[in-house]
Amino acid sequence: MSTRHRRRTRRGIAATTAFGVLALTPGLAWASATATPADAATTAAAAAPDHLDDLPFRDPDLSVDQRVDDLLGRLTRTETISLLHQFPLPVPRLGIGQFRSGTEALHGLAWTTSHEDGAVHTATATTFPQAVGLASTWDPELVEQVGTVVSDEARAYHAQDPDLWGLNLWAPVVNLLRDPRWGRNEEGYSEDPTLSSEIATAYGHGLTGDDPFYLKTAPTLKHYLGYNTETARDTVSAVLPPRALHEYEEQAFEPVIRANAATGVMTGYNLINGRPATADPSLDDTVRSWTDRTLFNVSDAAAPLNLVASQQYYDTQAEADAALVKAGLDSMTVNDNDPQPTIDAVQDALDQGLLEWSDVRTAASHNLELRFRLGEFDPDGGPYGDVGAVDTAAHRALARESATAAQVLLKNDGGTLPLDPATTGEVAVVGPLADTLYTDWYGGKQPYSVTPVDGIAARLGADAVATTEGVDRITLRDAETGRYLAGGAGSAGGPLAATADSPDTTAQFDVFDWGEGVVTLRSAANGKTVGFNWSGFANDQEQPNGWYVQQLFRIEERPDGDVVLRYAGYDSAESWSPSFATPYLVVADDGSLQLGARTADEATAFTRDVVVDGTAQAVAAAEEADAAVVVVGTMPFINGREAHDRTGLDLAAGQEALVRAVREANPNTIVVLTSSYPQTIGGLQESVPAILWTTHAGQETGNALADTLFGDADPAGRLTQTWPRSVDDLPDTMLDYDVVGSRQTYLYDDAHDPLYPFGYGLSYTSFRYSHLRVADRSVAPGDTVRVSVDVTNTGDVDGDEVVQLYTHQRTSRDDQPVRQLRDFDRVHVRAGQTVRVHLEVPVDALRHWDVTRDRWVVEASTHDLLVGASSTDVRARASVRVDGERIPARDLTRVTQAQNYDDADGTTLVDTTKERGTSVAATRDGAWVAYEDADLTNGARSLVASVAKAGDGPARLEVRLGAPDGRLVGSAEVPATGDARAYADVTVPIRRAAGRQDVYLVLGDGVRVSTFHLTS
């Protein structure tokens, strides 16, 4: 990427201490004030004698290594071991307070857990668009400003309570969004590694601050590595062949670490090629090789326990913890706030000789160095000790700017948008998301909320806005007793019971359709959502929420027209998720609503009556309006989240029907689609004139929407993911991580025509690209390809254009991407103006992983340079010749890792040993792996393979040429080796093999191959 994206023009954010601050008061409530909270270092050291400031580890003039060594020398063995836990022991005698890793800050300061009781504490802090929305700005400079605000607010909370609010932030998430069915799609940035790493680097730089040594906060990249599924996420293995691993998955992490925009990684729950990610040696071997800075690597919550429990990888926690430390993990997030089990397990590992004290000391030093860089042990708290401001005017303005910049205009037929406020009389703002803002699992509490209705009313005046949610209000009457189901009348709500004689508001419920049969019920009496509370059901929740969302239902119709209710909360596919044997609801003898039936036939039948027809209300409002804005979409706690993947991408049927009805009533209908992931909305694309997409964009959502709808801002967000026409365009399984082999994402998928391509987005103006120039048409490794293009705003309004540079390698030994993003720039162009945009790509970035030699290679080839407005909208093109290498024929006389195949079928990748190595494993008889273009010109006498075979009885290993069923040139029996990780050499005599050949190893079921080589 160009240096422009590296670092960093600041726009509009002065030092936050210059603004009026909302200072923290005891109890974490907010009060208006201008005072800056006391710095954390002063607070932590308050109980320490003054002479402690004279200790060497508190001397900022010493090197960090000297300070770490001095402090480690003063700690007891137990205190040192405790540094390997999320909540290490405080050391009052040295003035060291409670440290904690892990404050959530994905798109604003969000929440933390208490060291005292493990309880969750939520921050009231500036809330920005979800991460996928921040990336949709395609504006690293803006995202860096967001990171700056988040780190300022983290410092403010830390100053108020340093024991509770740590400065090691668990953000950003850089897992690539290769499949929109992933429940945590909203947390990531893009399906593209270049865009993801650029946005993550920008956010990370905002979080870390500008000091060359000290850190404002310490961001941690999540989740290393190959983590894209919630279903059984702690036992699923991400199968990553070398090219998918090195070219795709690692490239979301590596550039961020190299840019010093993160201080470590969090490991995923999953396994990587059969080995738990928490114990993968690449944490040390690979991740630490990307930087000369010390990294602090942490586990995800409770993941260390999985190695013994769900994964059954080790028999004891001592073995597991020893493996984690040796692999490069520094901190274990486990057993909530109690470090003692970790202390005991690590001490046990030391006693057994599974760990050396130097291993523990190294991990502990990583913890301490991070804290030194955060200024914790400096007498004055370091340069960021007095930074801290929350919800200032500047922060609010940035929240609005980022929410506006993230919006993507998907359709705009006939210039439907922008609406002219001078000629637009009344606007109907309808839909289930018209007058509410939803938070998500990794969002904090919004200081205030501007809904779409609020924003549009502020722009036009309240009298010019008619609004309704467009949802039905129903009653549910027990078909047997005739009594109505009702909740509590007060603001606190109350238990639901079928005891009401008449359908007053306590017996009326608004039904919100979220798709796939799932609904929520909101009480008309108090506006609270109905949920399960273990003793029954009550109308007492502000909105659906919680780790296992307990406010979800299915209303199932019986043949006689009555309905039954099925509880759909706690709907998770995690291995530890609870389940309910009796999910259907019954009315107990006392009238209370309870779980109690296994089947619909056993459930209580209710007569459902519609009190208010929501669609009819919306239609009536639309008929009287000059324009209708229908706000529909998803709810982050329902339509996929952590612990819950999606199966479909459709908009809820009830919401789509609402849009169609409003469109029929008012042709001037605009859809605002609010969602956290791509949706299959082909029907809307065909039926409405304008569609504007936004993520759940935080406290300023309504103002941002009004800015765009009325033309105060030109929409210039661009999609960071491909939007498919159908879920059928996606792979059969979410578990296929081989984007190269299975041709996933815009990079490789040339078989499907997307609804909206990667990089897509419309504008209120138009742009012409011209005069593409390439600085040098012939380049070599170490050079940089530099291009420039003129972009002219040919419309009548000023606007932003996101200029995108893609490349395509014309010739290669290996499959190459159809196109690949290399650089981009979001530029502002006034109406009639032409600007010259400069883009670049280092030639070394045109590399790919050579499986024949197990290393990076830049091939000799011509590369197409494609400049345009999206991955498919190419406006200018040129080419450049790269003077690189030519990959020679495979030399199989060298020891070859079996995983470095060109093609395979019926196999998976597994761990060679628990400590390191990757092997190919056959999952059926006749499985095969192919090694193409092997040089056998000197002949081959035998193939020697390192193999393992668990279970009883032998299996076969065959060597064939040309195809899996091609000419057989050798075979041998693979004996049972007694264990899947017990390898032995097997020699296969080879006959009549010469020339350049595609070599196939055909494997019997259960055979594992680590390495092999030919003898000649």
What kind of region is each of these model predictions?
Residues 2-8, 27, 31-849, 862-866, ...:
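Glycoside hydrolase catalytic-domain context in secreted enzymes
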Residues 854:
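Extracellular/periplasmic metallocenter environments
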Residues 778, 828, 857, 935-936:
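Residue-level "contact hotspot" at macromolecular interaction interfaces
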